A protein has these predicted regions:
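Hydrophobic alpha-helical interaction segments
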Residues: 135-239
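Short, surface-exposed loop/turn motifs that are enriched in glycine and acidic residues
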Residues: 64-65, 80-84, 131-138
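Amphipathic alpha-helical interface surfaces
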Residues: 35, 90-91, 141
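Short gly/ser-rich loop at a beta-strand->alpha-helix junction or flexible surface loop bordering the NTP-binding
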Residues: 51-54, 83-121
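Short, intrinsically disordered, mixed-charge
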Residues: 41-44, 94-96, 100, 151
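Short beta-edge/loop segments at beta->alpha junctions of small alpha/beta modules
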Residues: 2-80
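Short coil/turn segments at secondary-structure boundaries
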Residues: 22-23, 107, 161
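A short, charged helix-loop
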Residues: 119-130, 137
Length: 239
């Protein structure tokens, strides 16, 4: 009876789409098996939906069906641990929010400091992108910009040319201090990312903060970006 009451109170306080774990219900560990059975009964009648083992959410129902949780809810345990930021959403979902694509996807990419194998939670396939820089709330927008440059061939429903134009606008809107931070973070990325970032900065009349010095002067980079979009690309050995 106590378990049923705590479940009812917890669900009443939870927003639609908020992912709840077993620990969120405040039930002693020795009663977790009973709790899981009670939650699974609610899944069976449609009151709850299951994301993965031990993870549930209260679905918001519309005329088109139940809405899935936001990507940040599905992977929130991968984004923060003990109050510290340990990951961030990148890839198509993040690029859409940046105006780089209109593609909608259930796939989620998480930037993290260590390699992890892809996993599946409900209908969402989760992949991981190793991020060599430290991850903080402050630098996440910059890391996403660098990820977009790194993955420029893979951004869906657009072209590398169009993505380069949008990235130019995003980067040009940064303050000089943030531009310098962007270039510092870029030093941990592969040379082709630094070359393309440098070309975008130069083409938009922005300082490059010595990015050219970090590159091998005889190495060339094959990137599918036209001279119409980056007329200065040969300055950065981009073919």
């Amino acid at each position: 009876m106590v378990i049923a009451t705590q479940i009812k109170e917890c669900l009443a306080a939870a927003d639609y789409g908020m992912v709840l774990t077993i620990n969120d219900f405040g039930i002693e560990p020795r009663y977790h098996a009973t709790l899981v059975k009670a939650l699974n009964r609610k899944v069976a009648i449609g009151e709850l939906q299951k994301v993965s083992k031990g993870k549930y959410y209260k679905p918001k129902k519309t005329v088109f069906g139940s809405l899935s949780p936001a990507p940040s809810e599905i992977v929130k345990d991968l984004l923060e641990k003990n109050g510290k930021t340990v990951g961030y959403i990148t890839g198509t979902a993040a690029f859409a929010s940046m105006g780089l694509t209109t593609q909608i996807t259930s796939a989620i990419m998480v930037g993290t400091n260590r390699y992890r194998r892809p996993i599946t939670r409900g209908e969402s396939k989760i992949s991981f992108l190793v991020q060599p820089n430290s991850i903080t709330e402050e630098n996440i927008p910059l890391l996403r910009t660098l990820d977009a440059i790194k993955l420029i061939r893979e951004i869906p429903a657009t072209s590398p040319d169009d993505s380069t134009v949008v990235l130019g606008k995003i980067i040009s809107a940064l303050t000089k201090e943030r531009l310098q931070q962007l270039c510092q973070l870029a030093e941990a990325y592969k040379p082709s990312v630094r070359a393309l970032l440098g070309a975008i900065l130069e083409n938009n009349n922005q300082p490059t903060f010595g990015l050219e010095i970090t590159l091998n002067g005889v190495t060339t980079y094959k990137l599918p970006i036209s001279k119409n979009v980056l007329p200065n690309k040969h300055n950065w050995n981009i073919l």
